[in-house]
């Protein structure tokens, strides 16, 4: 064994061994308990970043640990390979998205191997291959036949100059990112999947997910947004149709003083025919894309349509306004406004001088003061005719019942969740498998024409999708009739909604899933990824699982038992102000810093001498130029060091602060482990350990070894607090470094301890552990070695610490045998100098003894 730890030599050797032996390839094995450990698949952007490294290290630690417990562990990896960035990169680099993507996959695959992740590479998949997306296309046609897919018009961002649809991220300050033209909202036909048909199940089954973070579950609950309320119909004077609104607060109905409709509502459109101000307002709304998240903070605007609705219970005429806070795609596109008891309605009414009528008493029974804001709390009704004096629940039911009896109301359950629009007017995605015949009939692409293959050898002009630009591509024949293919492609969330299931049978040719393999491996035991995916991906992932279950492919209700959301990786961020006042961000690698005695940065400059402003730690990002390249760190310190730092620096679900000093610390620790094994093995063979013949000191050290095994097992397995597991191993290493190594049994004990340490570190730092296991002559490869088991007998304490008090004041702490009698403890206490001093010349009046813990001598 060489004396120095040289990761650059051992890591590539061990990785080659894993490759040649196919160590991590698995097949279904009914005789073993399975464990499916999955990290969210990466987008092949070109290089791994530290966020990836953290995500995949956590997954690998768990997978390797479960494997050492004797389970059949599946840990696959693949590539979420479709998506918009590839189109931009292709234009920039004068290539096509496909070769750019495949080059990136090859490069990043080598980076993953360099980090030593134990993946089953035989299951690798890329979502941009027809072998993968053909099954998604087939499944979509099945969903269409089941009535779960439909087409309707929906608004998109449209650039009139480029004549193209823009993704939300391509709209910068309301303008096209390419040509700076003002973006319009345009209605175009798009495909939708009925996720709303599963809303109740998606909501209720959250209760089954005991091992998902509460934050994620509550985000999904809010996103689904189930509410119970009443749908109310209003007659409108001089208008051919009625207006329908939905409210969750029918108890406030007598305080409704106006209605508001979306700018795109037919009533607003009709009113605008003779109202130029309203027409201009509708135009303005059409070209302002409003994300629902921004609704709360944006300025509320509106125009009176001139129409009057009739309040069904009071007969009063109330105005109908067009307002920018009502969205056509939500509910009925119309809302009732109760400005006395809803803050948004209050602000709008105050701005435009509309009537504000209070109908709920304040908590103390007085009339509410509405001079500054609305009273939004529930309470007792007044000003409400026959409903006066009713509390919230009674009023809710009485008014709902009355409206229902009159035929103008209906109790309804509503959802915030909208159906999933899966059409994208982009090129680099899976083609949507639908065709339109000459007579206008729309139908799914027949099975014998699947997959609809996306041509990869294309020229990108950066504006129009190549399959839209080429009229020949869309032409096909169905049942002998000419037809046109759909030229939109799927939302890339489609591919990432079922990849986890395809990993169980990536080569299967007969269908989307081989049920036997899928049901052996699924559900996923632990799924690891960022919390930013809480609603979109993780909701579609759950939805798709239920769709596949209802198609008879899987027999479980949920795709993953446990979800672990890792924290972000932060790094120092620095900038200097340029000549034009712009911020130039400087990589922390290039910052020369001065620190105070507490280690805080007080001054910084770069190599060119610019004074740098230090903005603290923030998420690693391109925009702040504070990403640290994992490859550079692996080349400098080795993969094991980077992995160890990642797992030690912070709990897995908290943010991690990247500090190179911490990386150096992890590296020093691994050098110490190497050195101890080197010194131990240099002394030659080791005798067998004789547990019964150990000295007290040897017993104490062995107790520490086995207590550490018990703690690390609990920390990794049950608690998943990996940082505390590593801390416990480090603490044990400090004790081993000081332990005597001269006697035969000292060395036998050291052998037992080091074999345990190397196995406990193996999930974190597998290359060094593989090598040290061989040097220690461990049985077989460490990859097939069992996890160490704590010896209960070794952990039994044979002595205990007793606190000695005189008149309730602590005077000594003494170590006594566990089975010592009260007399023996008193005798031992009397030998302590301080205790003897306080007992000198006084009488002990009373003795309080708590066996093995406390001795209190009361004197006087």
Swiss-Prot record:
It is an enzyme of class 6 (ligase). It comes from the Bacteria. The keyword Hydrolase does not apply. A motif ('HIGH' region) lies at residues 42-52. GO terms for molecular function: aminoacyl-tRNA deacylase activity; ATP binding; leucine-tRNA ligase activity. This is Leucine--tRNA ligase. It is found in: Cytoplasm. Keywords: Aminoacyl-tRNA synthetase, ATP-binding, Cytoplasm, Ligase, Nucleotide-binding, Protein biosynthesis. Belongs to the class-I aminoacyl-tRNA synthetase family. A motif ('KMSKS' region) lies at residues 619-623. It catalyses: tRNA(Leu) + L-leucine + ATP = L-leucyl-tRNA(Leu) + AMP + diphosphate. Pfam families: Anticodon_1, tRNA-synt_1, tRNA-synt_1_2, tRNA-synt_1g. GO terms for cellular component: cytosol. PANTHER family: LEUCINE--TRNA LIGASE, MITOCHONDRIAL, LEUCYL-TRNA SYNTHETASE. ATP binds at residue 622. Its EC number is 6.1.1.4. GO terms for biological process: leucyl-tRNA aminoacylation.
